[in-house]
Amino acid sequence: MTTGAEARVNSAPIEAGLRHLVRIAGAIAGLPEGQVRSLMAEAVDEVDPVSVEEIILQSYLFAGFPRTLNAMRMWRVVSERPAPDSDPEAAAEDFDLWRRRGAETCEIVYGDSYERLRRNVCGLHPALDEWMIVEGYGKILSRPGVDLRTRELCVVAACAVSGQQRQLHSHLHGALNAGSSPGEIGGV
């Protein structure tokens, strides 16, 4: 799932579980449902099901809510796992916690570019900056269950498949900042 710019990076094999998650993330972002279902079926016995669910949940940031709903519906069928009874992480009881976690996670991903990112996004619209930090990085990308390195590699796959070049560029750097090697990124 590489584009021209990423293909120049020397790739290295990534472990099987991570490879499945990355492929699922990319598929949700831009492939037909049948292909998403096939990739899920290949992964069902090889990947922690909670990790798959976390990658599906985060896909709503990069693929939209309809694709996320459809992907989770497919995962329920393929995995034969029921939804959890509750998800305390999803409750809006501690909005300040989401904001704090979001700022911390976003700063890891963007590194030295963090302050400039915040200014640029706020310059587009203050609501987008708030949503990026609270919703994107705090509520979603800071959830437990999957480490930030894995999440960022999955974001790279989603951005590559969906042709989101600006976000792809940023998240290639973000994957490095979150601990991925250039070879792992090339393997995506």
Describe the residue ranges of each PLM region.
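Acidic, glycine/proline-rich low-complexity segments that act as flexible tails and inter-domain linkers
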Residues: 1-19, 26-51, 60-148, 177
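Short, structured motif recognition centered on aromatic/hydrophobic residues
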Residues: 19-27, 55-56, 150-160, 188
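Alpha-solenoid helical repeat scaffolds
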Residues: 31, 163-164
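Short conserved catalytic/interaction loops centered on acidic-Pro-aromatic/His motifs
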Residues: 39, 165-173, 186
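Residue-level detector of family-conserved "landmark" positions at structurally sensitive sites
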Residues: 52-53, 185
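Short, glycine/charged-rich beta-strand-loop motifs at protein surfaces that mediate ligand recognition
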Residues: 144, 157-162, 175
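All-alpha amphipathic helical-bundle segments outside canonical DNA-binding/catalytic cores
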Residues: 149-150, 183
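Alpha-helical oligomerization segments
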Residues: 176-188
